Amino acid sequence: MSSESTAIFTPIIDALHNQQVIAYPTEAVFGLGCDPDSEQAVNALLALKQRPWEKGLILIAADYAQLTPYIDDTALNEQQRATMFASWPGPVTWVIPARSETSRLLTGRFNSLAVRVSDHPLVQQLCRQFGKPLVSTSANLSGQEPCRSADEVQQQFGAAFPLLAGSVGGRLNPSEIRDVLTGEQIRQG
């Protein structure tokens, strides 16, 4: 990666290290994200979204290895892993048993965690440079439509909001969500 392309990530990585919530393009809409290991940042994201912690959150990553500190990989058999890996990187979010030490702010009232390996190049670069996954939820204030452009993010959240500019992918719908243990579809994509 050139130093020029690395430079666009520097203020966003700094914001993440400073426990701030950021906005970035994903496959379908702009996402709001933060450091999953920062209770302060996760609480700020939940407050911004007016989202109850009990619902749980999604982690988005550059690769599966970034997710393993948060999920119980030993709960999966080879077939479940193969099915999951066949869909990644891509627009399928899998609900996987969480490690017991994974924050309840991430899992909510569940013993599982929703995770996805993104195929959006900016998300992959962002997670690689940050060195871990991000909490990911749609960029919109309660009652408003998810943002599909940087301009819409700035209209809803203000011009000073930490924003990784770029284009969303071509998907019209949010990611499909499936349970890895049962294969059950939780949300249609």
UniProtKB/Swiss-Prot annotation:
InterPro entries: DHBP_synth_RibB-like_a/b_dom, Sua5-like_dom, TC-AMP_synthase, TC-AMP_synthase_SUA5. NCBIfam families: PRK10634.1. It comes from Serratia proteamaculans (strain 568). It is an enzyme of class 2 (transferase). The gene is tsaC. Keywords: ATP-binding, Cytoplasm, Nucleotide-binding, Nucleotidyltransferase, Transferase, tRNA processing. This is Threonylcarbamoyl-AMP synthase. Its EC number is 2.7.7.87. GO terms for molecular function: ATP binding; double-stranded RNA binding; L-threonylcarbamoyladenylate synthase; tRNA binding.
